Amino acid sequence: MTRDNNCSNSARHKLSLMGVIVTLGIVFGDIGTSPLYVMKAIVRAGNPVNVEYIIGAVSCIIWTLTLQTTVKYVLIALRADNKGEGGILALYALIRRHSRKWFYFLAIIGASTLIADGVITPSITVLSAIEGLKVYEPETPVVPIALCIVTVLFFIQQFGTNMIGKLFGPLMLLWFSMLGVLGAMHIGDYIPILQAFNPLHAIRLLTSNPEWFLILGAVFLCTTGAEALYSDLGHCGINNIRTSWAFVKIMLILNYLGQGAWIIAHVDNLTSGLNPFYAIMPHGMLFFGIVMATIAAIIASQALISGSFTIFSEAMNLKFWPRQKIKYPTDVKGQLYIPFVNMSLFILCVIVILFFKSSERMEAAYGLSITITMLMTTFLLSAYLTIRRVNRWLTLLFLIVFVGLESIFFVANMAKFMNGGWVTMLLASVMIAIMYVWYNATTIRNSQIQIRDVRESFSIISDIKNDESIPKYATNIVYLTKLGGKYDIEQKILYSIINKHPMRADHYFLLHIDYQDSPSTLEYDVTTLVPDTLYRINLRLGFRIHPLVNRYFRQIIEDMVANNEFSLASSYPSLAKHNVMGNFVFVLINRIYSTFTSFSFKERLIMDAYEWIDHLKLSMTRSLGLNTSNVLIENVPLTVKLHAKKAGNSIPRVERIEENGDFY
């Protein structure tokens, strides 16, 4: 029996007016702020800027939003949910047991490039919004103001955004409504702009213009938020996202049409640095528009930061990233805070703002990495469709169409590499390297575990328990094991109990944490191996569940006591008569990598890099949420097996299930 600790998807994600409004504030911040800079980038890429060019460019925007965002993500990707959760890592977790082993590398590349390009998002949206003040005062200190906003934004993450987050939906509803109204007001400036709905204008522009790659590089900015749309599936649900997208898309297209019509009507009077977004605003509402743009930019940035925390949390549980400290600033489910990630993103955003200094220069770097993320998602989605036995010809059509489309966008965005795109690519490369090393080193370490059948040691463990000549180490000893088989035990654990220094106790527990492919699983089973002596507990956690082992184990013990499976009473009569409970000690086996261990050349490189990265991780004790006062860490050498080739908040309940066999 499996339990998902979210309420049912139908309850959480039921289509409602309030759900749609909330979705606007969570999902569409990134894609919703694109009108701030897309048309400005298109005007700058045009040579010359004329009627045909603008109609063709707006046509490219409309059909990019239709094909890339609507068809791929809203209609197809949102159906590839992992128990209601979305995003590239959730998708990988869904298919990894049924796909090729190297698919993990696609997930690593996709997650790394998504985060790398995401560093630009807060910077470009905030800068674009603040630059509207230059209409009033050309000498406005945009960079210092943007730095102040970004600093405050990252600072408040540690306190949670539950209270102000309730305003995000209504504010984004106002923002999108403003976009649509402003655009509709100016379509009349040049009615033939409606010809942009004909895709032939887009095709004609791209096939006749030798600088098509510059145009597509600018056009692609309109859909950079599509991947975030998929990642936020678990927060809002498919029905609310699809319904709200219909409204968002209409408002976006109206705004792009209005900006395009205004540009054509004033094509002879365009000046360098002009932003059509602010140009279509009546002068009397310009200040209001700038304020709304700034608010929308902050909401978009907040969504990205929260999404980054979620991605890193998933990456940790999927063994892609070293364990980091995770905090829960509010009682809202899924709202977490990772100090290391928050500080890293803040520093990178500050560096990006100081390096580029303007949204115009930032546009030249934005979008390159996210095209790679989209390509990786396409490959994983194709694998998902294959596993689900969708018609092979439809799957092949999906693969060909979107790999072709995204490859064209990638080639177009490669023109940005020397203009700043290298910044995000460098960051993505560093993250890919860390994830690759961490995942493979973890795999190597786990492959070297020497497995024994614990049944062969039942008698000696019982004898140690009853041997009063051996000093009792603790009443209860809990060993964390990486093995999930019912009778499997690590040789190093047996060595710790029997050989190193006999670990006498009244009860021994083998606790195995099994991370599941589903996001929110929280369950356990108990097997009594030796009555009143040795127990095995398999604790299954979804990849979005933080391993608060101390709290979950305490609850499991309480359940066992309630079921008369276990007694907490001290074995010492003098303490038992005063109802003093026996103590618990957790023993963690830390396998130390030695340079003398025999590995292949590739494995040695990976393990050497792992040793360096290992300094960044949280200690085993803290990462598992254990109390340091009752934890013993035993360091043992990481040895190659003989047969190997040389070279503070409310915590959800964890539900017990009946064992249905061995779990590996």
Question: Which sequence ranges carry the predicted segments?
Answer:
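The structured alpha-helical core of multi-pass membrane proteins
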Residues: 2-664
